[in-house]
Amino acid sequence: MTINVGINGMGRIGRMVIRAIIESQNKDIKIKHINNRSNSEASCTLIKYDSVHGKFNADLDYDDNHLIINKNKITFSQESKIEDINWNKFGVDYVFECTGKFNSKEKLVAHINNGAKKVIVSAPCKNADKTIVFGVNEDQLNKNDQIISAASCTTNCLAPVANVLHKNFEIEKGFMTTIHAFTSDQRILDNSHKDPRRARSASQSIVPTSTGASKAIGEIIPSLKGKLEGVAMRVPTPNVSLIELVFCTKKEISKDKINNAFTEVSKNQLKKVLEITSEKLVSIDFNHNSSSAIVDSSLTNVVGTNMGKISAWYDNEWGFSNRMCDIAEYVHKIS
């Protein structure tokens, strides 16, 4: 049975969700309606031509009230308040909330009141019914969950990596650094921002800033609550990021033991969510990679028998957008 979806917000993630659905030729998800503050002409141009992911290989057109993809007319609106989007009228069952502006259940319940059955949020969300990292804790979902957070791109990389380590070696504590591509929240040139570091030119500096990914792990994997901390270093690249997790374990570890554990799960239970590579690659080589985490086995290291470091690449746009679609399909299957 097809899932009829709507998308609120055509920023970086909203556009990538659309591309993920179309490029994968996913017959289980049908886009019925898009709401975006800019008009259909501007939205059509931005999804067709992308500076990071290249030209969208689809037949794209528009009129005043539609975005037309491969001759499929998708109704289009420009409501600034979610209370004004009538999802019921457009035949939408699931909403991908991709604005990044509505980050609490109290705000998002308006989607449900307007006809949506489920809302999948592209960001951390206060009081969400569930926060899900696909490949780690989707089995916690039930048919009554309505507001579902897909966490963040960094959490989607860190969680499966930490989970594999914890199951195999029992993490006692750890510290994560994400070397993260700059995002649209930063300034191209120095300008005002509530974070004085993000106020500085994204293309000229390494910008230390906060990340909630390490603390969010405790919500995803309760046995790791309070055991991880982290920081983000924004760097002057437009896409693809890298986590480095330094950790201490109860069980003895070695480079081979760690890499073998990831090789095993990449072929089985985490296939398509987690990959492992031994090639000596750089960030651009992982652009448009749909996995949540690509462990770089050449960077795995240990000190003694109980302290280690693991590195994992992730396309912070494309991988995350694909996991949002996976969550929608999983929820639909159990509902």
Question: How would you label these PLM feature ranges?
Answer:
Residues 14, 18, 109, 159-166, ...:
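Predominant activation on well-ordered alpha-helical scaffold segments within soluble catalytic domains
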Residues 63, 128, 202, 239-241, ...:
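A generic structural signal for well-ordered coil/turn residues at beta-strand boundaries
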Residues 10, 14, 104, 151-154, ...:
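Generic structural signal for well-ordered, non-membrane alpha-helical segments
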